[in-house]
């Protein structure tokens, strides 16, 4: 009995690990990006990239900087799908957007912004979403702005998130290896 439980646990772990979706965050901006995920900030130099693996059950966001007034790349891996969207819903220093019904209404209610950096999410073989400026149509602009979430099978081989898409990609500074 214990052997069956151990084998099932190992196989379940392997299956979960096998379904990890690599998300590569690339910085085409002229300045560094502070990739933040509500727990950790990683600096991505201009022209450089970093990869995070999203496992089944992941639900969260990534943005440039710790300030919540930012363009968000939002992901959920659940029920056999990778769900993704860009959000520019304004938040304020003291309050969230509440029940606002437009981008302008949310900005007035929160006295805040939701856009800080151009961004594109491009899953392999699925619909890309792009937000180059405040008010972009591919992004959630207010809480009930339905229809902005997209889905891919969780077998999607990779996702590329690009900060400042369309900008000439700077050269990534060489990293020296210390012996």
Regions found by a protein language model. Give the residues of each.
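Extracellular low-complexity, O-glycosylation-prone Ser/Thr/Pro/Gly-rich "stalks"
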Residues: 23-179
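Fungal secretory targeting signals
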Residues: 1-22, 178-179
């Amino acid at each position: 009995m214990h052997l069956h439980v151990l084998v099932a646990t190992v196989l379940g772990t392997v299956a979960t690990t096998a379904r990890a979706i690599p998300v590569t965050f690339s910085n085409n901006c002229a300045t560094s990006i502070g990739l933040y995920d509500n727990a950790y900030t990683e600096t991505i130099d201009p022209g450089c990239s970093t990869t995070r693996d999203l496992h089944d059950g992941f639900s969260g966001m990534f943005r440039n900087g710790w300030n919540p007034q930012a363009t968000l790349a939002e992901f959920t891996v659940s029920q056999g799908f990778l769900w993704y969207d860009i959000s520019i819903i304004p938040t304020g220093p003291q309050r969230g957007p509440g029940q606002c019904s437009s981008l302008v209404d949310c900005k007035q209610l929160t006295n805040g912004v939701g856009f800080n950096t151009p961004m594109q999410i491009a899953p392999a073989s699925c619909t890309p979403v792009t937000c180059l400026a405040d008010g972009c149509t591919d992004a959630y602009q207010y809480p009930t702005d339905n229809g902005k979430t997209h889905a891919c099978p969780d077998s999607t081989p990779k996702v590329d998130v690009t900060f400042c898409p369309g900008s000439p990609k700077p050269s990534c500074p060489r990293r020296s290896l210390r012996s």
